[in-house]
C-alpha cells in the first residue's frame, strides 16, 4: 500500500490516492474518504495539556486508521521518561478505545533517534511505530529495523533528510534493502513524505514498479 503524506499549509489532497494528513502543517482535521491517518502537531508530551490535545484529535478522527506522533521536537536530549510514559499511556488507552492506532515516530536527532528508546516506549505503552527511513543514516537502517520490527505499523519513505529537507530518491538503490526488510516484517504501508508534487509522483512510480518485482 502506497500513501502520500500531505505536508503543506495549503492542505492539498490527491483525490485518487491514499493520504496521510499532516496536522503539524495544516491543523484542520479533514475527513475525506481517502485519508487513512494523521500526523499529530508537534507537542511537548511532558505537559498534561498535550494529553488533552491528542485525546481531542483522536476523538475527532474516529473511523480513521492511525495517528503518528513525535515524542519530542528532535533536539531534546534529556527526557523525563517516567512522565512521558505516564502521559502516553493515557493517550494510547484512549486511542485503543476509539480504534485508532497510536504510532510513535523515530527522529533524526535526540531521544527517539535511538532505536532502543523507541522500542522501550512502544513496548511499555503497547503502541505502534512509524518507521521514518530518511531519519536514519544509510548504514544504520537495517539495525534500527531489527530492533523495532515487532512494533512497526507504517513507514515514511524518501531518500534521506539533509539540512532539514527531505530529499527524493533518484533511484531505489539505497532504499531497496530497507524496503525489502520492511516487507519481510509485514510492514506494507509506505507513506511518501516529500513536499514537491513531481518528486512525490516520481517516487510513487518507482515504488510501484519495485513492488511488482518484490519476492
Give residue spans per PLM region.
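Active-site-proximal loop/turn and secondary-structure-junction residues that shape catalytic pockets
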Residues: 8-10, 25-28, 40-44, 71-75, ...
Amino acid at each position: 500500500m502506497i500513501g502520500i503524506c500531505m505536508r503543506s499549509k495549503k492542505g492539498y489532497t490527491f483525490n485518487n490516492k491514499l493520504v496521510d494528513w499532516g496536522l503539524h502543517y495544516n491543523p484542520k482535521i479533514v475527513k475525506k474518504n481517502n485519508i487513512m491517518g494523521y500526523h499529530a502537531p508537534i507537542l511537548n508530551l511532558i505537559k498534561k495539556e498535550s494529553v488533552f490535545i491528542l485525546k481531542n484529535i483522536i476523538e475527532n478522527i474516529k473511523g480513521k486508521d492511525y495517528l503518528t506522533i513525535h515524542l519530542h521536537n528532535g533536539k531534546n536530549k534529556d527526557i523525563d521518561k517516567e512522565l512521558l510514559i505516564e502521559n502516553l499511556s493515557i493517550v494510547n488507552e484512549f486511542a485503543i478505545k476509539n480504534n485508532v492506532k497510536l504510532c510513535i515516530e523515530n527522529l533524526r536527532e535526540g531521544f527517539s533517534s535511538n532505536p532502543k528508546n523507541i522500542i522501550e516506549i512502544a513496548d511499555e505503552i503497547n503502541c505502534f511505530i512509524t518507521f521514518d527511513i530518511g531519519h536514519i543514516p544509510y548504514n544504520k537502517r537495517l539495525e534500527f529495523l531489527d530492533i523495532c520490527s515487532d512494533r512497526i505499523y507504517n513507514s515514511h519513505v524518501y531518500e534521506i533528510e539533509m539540512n532539514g529537507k527531505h530529499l527524493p530518491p533518484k533511484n531505489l538503490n539505497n532504499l531497496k534493502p530497507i524496503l525489502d526488510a520492511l516487507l519481510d516484517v509485514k510492514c506494507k504501508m509506505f507513506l511518501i513524505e516529500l513536499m514537491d508534487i513531481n518528486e512525490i509522483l516520481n517516487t510513487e512510480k518507482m515504488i510501484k514498479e519495485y513492488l511488482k518485482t518484490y519476492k
